């Protein structure tokens, strides 16, 4: 081994490696479990002068700069869950940590890691089957169900009053309906078609939905109209100016009048482009590139509103909002590529001016969120993204389960009932999986300020008596018989993803029995430079 590995390389093997990795997972579990659920506590994330206060799992894990490879694996798992379903990031790290904590007890009983892994995999397979039987199929067109799902998602956020929460819920639902694509009985919600604009100043109650796109730009010339109705829209990916050639050239000027002639030619070139835009009936011209002063002046004189240097993402949203195609050159532009806007208007939002481009048929919309400061509006944006994702998940898989730990407790109960069918020592791991799910419920009750032992005893009793939807009423810190009545519901898709990802992460860590930490490469000594001040 001394000749195989570089000098200074460290190696550890066997259960020592597994137990060390489990210890790292338990540290992450301790860090995140207090943020679980609607009453979860916030974390303050500090990076230089930037401060973020949040209980959003995705934000917490994205800002954690961990060094240990096991911690990195768990963080990447959480990020994957966030990408797939947009929710459940805290849950997946907590559940993976609990599975590894239970595995540690089995390892101490001399149960082999392979046996534990196989038991966990069988428990996962059984859990996914049981989830389908526990879940209720719903119609995506049932607005009450959609409302309750968004309510559950946003109830863990910091919206101060029930009135504000209801306003934000309705805003989320209306925005989703505006961009919803229904084909052959299936639904598709592309969240990229919903733009969120954050404005400092005002209250959440002042937030609004705009059927169209709001761009943080002003018209390029002060003489341009500040408002126009029923306008034709042109979107461009080319500049309105005389472009520089790739080849450097010099002009020889022998007469001052030649300068004027050269400038007149430039103006004529730009005027030709503006005249074509005007001839097509365009009243709003937006480009991703630059517009020079001459073009701005000429368009202002012609009553055309123009924006320059607009972000590509906004151009694409405007295309979906107005129906305009993006022209790549003036030569290719034609009237059939134009879109329409019912209203174009410059408005003040906070301390800045924005251009509102609205259309009744817009397939892209803007949600304007107002709050007292950046931290508040940033957290509100994260909350809205979670809510939009919850609706998307429901449309992809129209099944719901009761929240508040109800589905985890019911799964734990049914897994224990089926454990007798699992042969050998794998049965111990199968039961440990159920214990981890129940421990998850215990943590949820603790974040609600309840005594976890009393809460777990009561919820077990209710599920044993057939109340499959009994869970933790976080608001009143009690166990309630039917969480669906309290509008506390979760998407089946999120629960499935959390179970799969947590189990995969836990089993991946349990499979590692050898860790080799390579020594850092020795740096070659730099040759000394002669001192010019010495002889």
Swiss-Prot record:
EC number from the UniProt entry: 3.6.4.-
Sample GO molecular function, one term: ATP hydrolysis activity
Keywords: ATP-binding, Chaperone, Cytoplasm, Hydrolase, Nucleotide-binding
First-listed, main subcellular location of the protein, grouped into a coarse class: cytoplasm
SUPFAM superfamilies: GroEL apical domain-like, GroEL equatorial domain-like, GroEL-intermediate domain like
Superkingdom to which the source organism belongs: Archaea
PROSITE patterns: TCP1_1, TCP1_2
Family matches, as Pfam families: Cpn60_TCP1 (PF00118)
Annotated catalysed reactions: ATP + H2O = ADP + phosphate + H(+)
Keyword Hydrolase (UniProt): yes
Cellular localisation: Cytoplasm
Top-level EC class: hydrolase
Similarity comment text for this entry: Belongs to the TCP-1 chaperonin family.
NCBIfam families assigned to the protein according to its UniProt record, in alphabetical order: thermosome_alpha (NF041082), thermosome_arch (TIGR02339), thermosome_beta (NF041083)
Protein's job: Molecular chaperone; binds unfolded polypeptides in vitro, and has a weak ATPase activity.
Subunit structure and binding partners: Forms a heterooligomeric complex of two stacked nine-membered rings; one of alpha and the other of beta subunits.
Protein name, UniProt field: Thermosome subunit gamma
Species of the source: Saccharolobus shibatae (strain ATCC 51178 / DSM 5389 / JCM 8931 / NBRC 15437 / B12) (Sulfolobus shibatae)
Taxonomic path: Archaea, Thermoproteota, Thermoprotei, Sulfolobales, Sulfolobaceae
């Amino acid at each position: 081994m001394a000749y195989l590995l570089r000098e200074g390389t460290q190696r550890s093997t066997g259960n020592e490696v597994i137990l060390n990795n489990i210890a790292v997972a338990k540290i992450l579990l301790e860090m995140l479990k207090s943020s679980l659920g609607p009453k979860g506590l916030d974390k303050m994330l500090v990076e230089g002068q930037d401060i973020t206060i949040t209980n959003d799992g995705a934000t917490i894990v994205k800002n954690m700069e961990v060094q240990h490879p096991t911690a990195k694996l768990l963080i990447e798992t959480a990020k994957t869950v966030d990408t797939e379903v947009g929710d459940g990031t805290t849950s997946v790290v907590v559940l993976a940590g609990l599975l590894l904590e239970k595995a540690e007890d089995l390892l101490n009983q001399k149960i082999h890691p392979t046996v534990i892994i196989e038991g966990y995999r069988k428990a996962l397979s059984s859990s996914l089957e049981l989830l389908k039987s526990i879940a209720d199929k719903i119609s995506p067109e049932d607005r009450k169900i959609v409302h309750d799902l968004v309510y559950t998602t946003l109830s863990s956020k910091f919206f101060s009053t029930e009135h504000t929460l209801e306003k934000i819920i309705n805003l989320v639902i209306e925005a989703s309906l505006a961009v919803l694509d229904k084909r052959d009985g299936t639904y598709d919600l592309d969240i990229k078609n919903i733009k969120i604009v954050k404005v400092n100043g005002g209250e959440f109650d002042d937030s609004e939905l705009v059927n169209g796109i709001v761009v943080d730009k002003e018209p390029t010339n002060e003489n341009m109209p500040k408002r126009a109705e029923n306008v034709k829209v042109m979107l461009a990916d080319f500049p309105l100016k005389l472009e520089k050639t790739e080849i450097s050239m010099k002009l020889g000027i022998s007469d001052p009048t030649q300068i004027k002639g050269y400038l007149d030619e430039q103006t004529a070139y730009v005027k030709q482009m503006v005249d074509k835009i005007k001839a097509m009936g365009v009243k709003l011209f937006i480009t991703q590139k630059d517009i020079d002063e001459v073009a701005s002046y000429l368009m202002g004189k012609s009553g055309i509103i123009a924006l320059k240097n607009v972000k590509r993402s906004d151009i694409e949203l405007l295309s979906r909002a107005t129906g305009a195609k993006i022209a790549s050159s003036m030569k290719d532009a034609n009237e059939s590529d134009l879109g329409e806007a019912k209203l174009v208007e410059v408005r003040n939002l906070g301390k800045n001016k924005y251009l509102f481009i609205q259309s009744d048929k817009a397939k892209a919309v803007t949600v304007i969120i107002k709050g007292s400061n950046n931290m508040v509006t940033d957290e509100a944006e994260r909350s809205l993204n979670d809510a939009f994702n919850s609706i998307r998940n429901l449309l992809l898989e129209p099944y719901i389960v009761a929240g508040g730990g109800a589905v985890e407790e019911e799964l734990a109960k049914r897994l224990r009932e089926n454990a007798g069918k699992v042969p050998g020592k794998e049965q111990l791991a199968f039961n440990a999986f159920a214990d981890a799910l129940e421990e998850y419920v215990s943590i949820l009750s603790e974040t609600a300020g309840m005594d976890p032992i009393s809460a777990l005893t009561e919820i077990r009793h209710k599920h044993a008596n057939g109340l499959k939807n009994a869970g933790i009423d976080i608001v009143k810190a009690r166990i309630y018989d039917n969480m669906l009545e309290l509008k506390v519901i979760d998407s089946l898709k999120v629960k499935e993803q959390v179970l799969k990802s947590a189990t995969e992460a836990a089993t991946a860590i349990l499979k590692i029995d050898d860790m080799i930490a390579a020594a850092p490469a020795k740096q070659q000594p730099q040759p000394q430079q002669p001192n010019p001040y010495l002889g």
